[in-house]
């Protein structure tokens, strides 16, 4: 995390350029003004990339949106929750397994049932690991408390690359630059060994303002051993 270093670096910058200015260096003020202007513009766009759509009348492609990682998670939880409801109709309780600590935490936060149970009986778990990969390694495992239950294994797929002519298509408002779903992947071996059956329910799009922002691949896992 670079955040703690930002303020000290600003102080170092001021000390350096103040000394140069006092020594008679030229163009310090013009360069400072240019830097502040460019920085203000970039920060404004980076903190609200929807402005690109308002300025150009074209939404920024999701693959290029730096805010993609912080958007669409409530909708992702809704998509996962809908699949959970379908599996729960089979009559067994359903818990969730995330392939990454990020998606595990996001589902815990945005699914009301998971958020309500997080302190006493967690509903969302991180996939098992032999060594500590994150804080979830130290939490109780679902293998201890959810035997004979069903589960959803959720992982986010990487968005495919934009085609080489995406800029021209984007400029002409041709939706052909919109990316197709990534190919399905097989379930991990450890997951197959833990359940009686593991079924890939498909690649589920997560929309934000009408554009696919994420794809999540969801596996229906039945009867934990």
Where are each of the predicted segments found?
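A short small-residue
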Residues: 57-61
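Hydrophobic/aromatic-rich transmembrane helices and adjacent perimembrane loops
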Residues: 1-24, 31
């Amino acid at each position: 995390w670079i955040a703690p270093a930002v303020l000290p670096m600003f102080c170092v910058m001021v000390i350096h350029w103040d000394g140069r200015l006092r020594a008679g260096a030229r163009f310090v003020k013009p360069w400072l003004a240019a830097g502040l202007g460019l920085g203000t513009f970039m920060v404004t766009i980076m903190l609200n990339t929807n402005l690109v759509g308002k300025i150009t009348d074209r939404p920024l492609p999701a693959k290029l949106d730096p805010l993609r990682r912080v958007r669409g998670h409530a909708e992702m939880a809704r998509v996962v929750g809908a699949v959970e409801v379908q599996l729960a109709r089979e009559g067994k309780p359903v818990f969730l397994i995330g392939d990454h600590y990020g998606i595990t935490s996001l589902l815990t936060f945005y699914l009301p049932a998971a958020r309500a149970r997080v302190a006493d009986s967690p509903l969302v778990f991180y996939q098992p690991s032999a060594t500590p990969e994150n804080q979830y390694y130290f939490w109780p495992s679902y293998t201890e408390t959810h035997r004979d239950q069903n589960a959803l294994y959720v992982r986010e797929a990487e968005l495919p690359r934009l085609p080489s002519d995406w800029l021209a298509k984007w400029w002409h408002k041709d939706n052909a630059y919109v990316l197709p779903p990534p190919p399905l992947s097989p379930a991990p071996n450890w997951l197959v060994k833990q359940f009686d059956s593991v079924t890939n329910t498909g690649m589920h799009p997560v929309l934000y303002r009408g554009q696919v922002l994420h794809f999540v691949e969801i596996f229906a896992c039945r009867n934990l051993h």
